Amino acid sequence: MDKMRTLQSLIVKLTLLYGALCMLQTENVKEINKQECIQNAVYNFNTTDSKYLDPKCVTIFMDQYRGLKNLLNYTEDQMNYIFSLERAMMRKHHINDKRHKRQAMTRPRQECRTLTDDARNNLFNTIVDLKAPSNGMSRYDTIAGLHRQAIANAHMGANFLGWHRLYLDMFEMALQETRSDVVLCYWDSTLDFLMPGTSQVNTVSFSAELFGNGRGVVINGPFRFWRLPGGRTLQRFIARPGSSLTRPGVVDLIATDPRINTNSQIVFRGQGFPDPDTGRPGHSWEDEHNNTHVWVGGVMQNVVSSPQDPVFWFHHTYVDYVWELFRQKIGPGAREQYPADASGPHAPDAPMIGFDMLQNRDGYSDEHSRMYAMHPRCSNNCGNSRFLLCPNNGPMADPNRRCVSRAVNSDMVPAAAISAPEAAGFSAMSPMGAFGPAAVGPSSVGRMASRSGAARVSLQATDTVAIRAAMSEPPLQLEGPSFTSSFDDPRI
C-alpha cells in the first residue's frame, strides 16, 4: 500500500512537473515569437497592409499596437509615422538584427549657443518644418504626444534616463529625415544660472536670436506664435520665484565625484546623493532636471505637455549630455548596469512604453550613446560664441571654468504693436501706449519699418506685448501633473 501511494505521489509530481515544463516552454515560445514578430514588424510593418507579418505574431503585435493607438488617440497615419521612426532607429543601431552594420555616427551634439548661425538656423527651421501640418498631421505634435503615455514608465524612476535618451533619438531621426545635416543641440542652463544677481531673467537664451522671449506668449524667435494642440499659443514665464535653473554644483558632483559611481546613485528612488546646497539626502539627476522645467514655466512645467515647447528638446539633450559625462566617468560595464532594484514600470525587463522593440534595460546600452562636444569653458574660448563670455571672477587658473550667458536689454516685437498699437489690439490708454514711436526714439522707428516686420524695443516693452497677448487668450488647460522644483534660487 505504501509503495502504491509513493508511486501515485510520484506520478502526480511528474504530471505537475510536465505541466509546468509545458507552460514554461509555451511561454518561451511566445517570447521567441514575440521577439521575431517585433523584429519583423518594426522592419516591415504598415497598419494598412499586414501581409508582411507572419500570421503567428499578428495577435501578439496588434494587441500592443491597439493599446498604444487607443492610449494616444492617434490615427493610422500617426501610428505608421511612429513605427517608421522606430524602424529607422533600429536600423541605425542594428537592434535585433546583427546583419545590419551600425551606421557611422553623426557629428557631436554641442551647446546651442556655440553653433554657427547657419547650423542653428537650419536646426530651428527644421523643427518648424516638422511642426507644419502635412497630410493633415503635424509630425512634431505626433512625436510630442508620445510623451503623454510615458509618465509612469519614463518619470520618477530608473527608466527616466534611458527612455528620454531614446525619445531624443527618435526626434533627431525625424529631423534628419527632413534635413540630413542637422543635429540636436543642448542648452546648458548652468551658464544662465551663473549670471550674477537677478540678471538671468535677461539671458540671451530667451531672446529673438535663440529660443524666443521668455515671458508671456512667444512673439519672437524661430518658434514665435507656435500653436499648441487645441489652438492656444505657446507661452512661457521664466524665472518665477520658487524655481531654479540647473546648478553647476550638482552637475559637477555627477560628472566628477568618484564616490558617485553607479546609476543607482543618480536616479529617482535610487540611493541618491546629498544636495550640495541644502544638504538634503536622496537628490537625483531627475530631481535637478525638474527645476529647469519649473523655471521655464508655461507648458514646460507640465509633465504631459512639456515637449510642446521646443525648449524641451534642448533641455533634455543637456540632461543626456550630463548622463553621458557620468557614464564615461564610471567606465564600461558599470555604465550599462540598470538599477536591479527598480520595480513596476521601471523594472529592468519591463517594456519601454512607446518603443515596442525594447525593454527598459536597453536604454542603458552603449548602442544608444551619443558623442557630445564639451560644454563651453574659458579654456576653449567659450566655443567662440557671441552669446557667451568668460567671467572675471572665479578661479582664473582653472581650465574648466564655465562660461556665462550674456544678458540682453532689448528684444524684438511685431512692428504693428509699436507703430499702431490699437491695430495690434492695444488701446491708446493701455501700457503699450508708452512704447509708441515717441517713446522708443527715431532710430527704433526706422528699425520697426524694416522688412522683418519687427521692431527692437526694451525688454520691458517686449514683456508688455507678450503678456498682453497671453491675457487675450483663455487660460491654458493642461492635463496631468506638473513638475515641482527641489530648489528655490533666492536671487529670483
UniProtKB/Swiss-Prot annotation:
One of its GO terms (cellular component) is extracellular region. SUPFAM superfamilies: Di-copper centre-containing domain. It comes from the Eukaryota. InterPro entries: Di-copper_centre_dom_sf (IPR008922), Tyrosinase/Hemocyanin (IPR050316), Tyrosinase_Cu-bd (IPR002227). This is Tyrosinase-like protein 1. Prismatic layer of shell (at protein level). Expressed primarily in the mantle with highest level in the mantle edge and lower level in the mantle pallium. Keywords: Copper, Metal-binding, Oxidoreductase, Secreted, Signal. It is found in: Secreted. Its cofactor is Cu(2+). Its main location: secreted. Cu cation A binds at residues 147, 155, 164. PANTHER family: TYROSINASE FAMILY MEMBER, TYROSINASE-LIKE PROTEIN TYR-1-RELATED. Residues 1-22 form the signal peptide. Pfam families: Tyrosinase. Residues 482-492 have a biased composition (Polar residues). Gene3D superfamilies: Di-copper center containing domain from catechol oxidase. The keyword Metal-binding applies. Residues 472-492 are annotated as: Disordered. Its EC number is 1.14.18.-. Cu cation B binds at residues 289, 293, 316. Transmembrane segments: none annotated. GO terms for molecular function: metal ion binding; oxidoreductase activity. Binds 2 copper ions per subunit.
